[in-house]
């Protein structure tokens, strides 16, 4: 739901006899709202970076393991970044944490271009088409705020002759997304996409169901729930993000079984 609707939904639950409510996906960052009702909880992914630090670590690891990524040998990462909808709570943090994490690892970023792809494949392709036309093989890395935009970026670079044979391509731009959607996993397997971040919807769903069972049976909300983090102030149960590369595709695939 729209997080601004949370107070209204909470009031409805109070009026209905103090019915428990569990919010998920979009975090309610105004903790006064979530703490205004003892039977309100939220299930989200870990951290305020929305997976960007893990995404950045994949870029850092690739940079260190593949010296050829520094195409012009200047010691800087020539980066293009596709941001999500500016109105979404995850968009700016993903962008900011991505860049700060890379820079904190001692890698200087030369940001060639940054724009919003609005979470949409077609919009991201349009942006990347323009960037590839302008910068071509100067681009050393493309990072997108979600997988849909990463797929749009891939479509653009492949149309320009990049990434067509995965990492063995004569012209290659590492591309990273977030979500580890089923449609991107085959692209990671082929090397056309370099990595993604799993926002574990399966575990989130299982956690929500277990919490609902607990709350309706008078137990503590997180009783018997393992492998998650809790934050008392936010009344949040957080499911960890996971980096997904060729090396652990089975982890992502298992969430869709």
Language-model segments: which ranges?
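Hydrophobic alpha-helical
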Residues: 1-19, 97-98, 112-187
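Flexible loop/hinge segments that line or gate small-molecule binding clefts
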Residues: 9-50, 69, 73-75, 182-189, ...
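Short glycine-enriched loops at secondary-structure junctions
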Residues: 25-29, 85, 117, 178-181
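Hydrophobic alpha-helical segments within soluble ligand-binding/sensing domains
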Residues: 42-76, 124-125, 180-184, 200-220
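Short, solvent-exposed amphipathic alpha-helices that sit
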Residues: 51-58, 89-108, 123, 127, ...
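Hinge/cleft segment of the Venus flytrap/periplasmic-binding protein
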Residues: 75-78, 82-86, 100-101, 200-257
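Short beta-strand elements in bilobed, periplasmic/extracellular small-molecule ligand-binding domains
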Residues: 78-81, 103-121
């Amino acid at each position: 739901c729209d997080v601004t609707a949370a107070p209204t939904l909470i009031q409805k639950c109070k009026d209905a006899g103090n019915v428990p409510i569990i919010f998920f996906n979009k975090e309610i960052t105004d903790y006064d709202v979530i703490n205004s009702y003892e039977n309100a909880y939220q299930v989200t992914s870990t951290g305020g970076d929305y997976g960007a630090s893990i995404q950045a670590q994949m870029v850092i690891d690739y940079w260190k393991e593949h010296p050829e990524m520094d195409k012009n040998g200047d010691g800087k990462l020539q980066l293009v970044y596709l941001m999500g909808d500016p109105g979404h709570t995850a968009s700016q943090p993903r962008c900011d944490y991505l860049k700060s994490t890379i820079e904190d690892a001692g890698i200087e970023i030369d940001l060639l271009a940054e724009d919003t792809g609005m979470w949409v494949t077609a919009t991201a392709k349009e942006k990347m088409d323009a960037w590839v036309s302008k910068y071509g093989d100067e681009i050393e890395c493309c990072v997108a705020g979600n997988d849909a935009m990463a797929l749009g970026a891939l479509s653009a670079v492949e149309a320009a002759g990049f990434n067509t044979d995965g990492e063995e391509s004569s012209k290659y731009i590492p591309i990273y997304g977030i979500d580890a959607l089923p449609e991107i996993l085959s692209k990671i397997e082929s090397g056309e996409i370099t990595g993604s971040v799993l926002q574990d919807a399966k575990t989130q769903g299982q956690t929500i169901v277990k919490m609902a069972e607990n709350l309706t049976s008078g137990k503590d909300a997180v009783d018997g729930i393992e492998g998650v983090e809790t934050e008392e102030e936010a009344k949040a149960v957080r499911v960890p993000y996971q980096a997904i590369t060729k090396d652990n595709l089975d982890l992502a695939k298992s969430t869709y079984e």
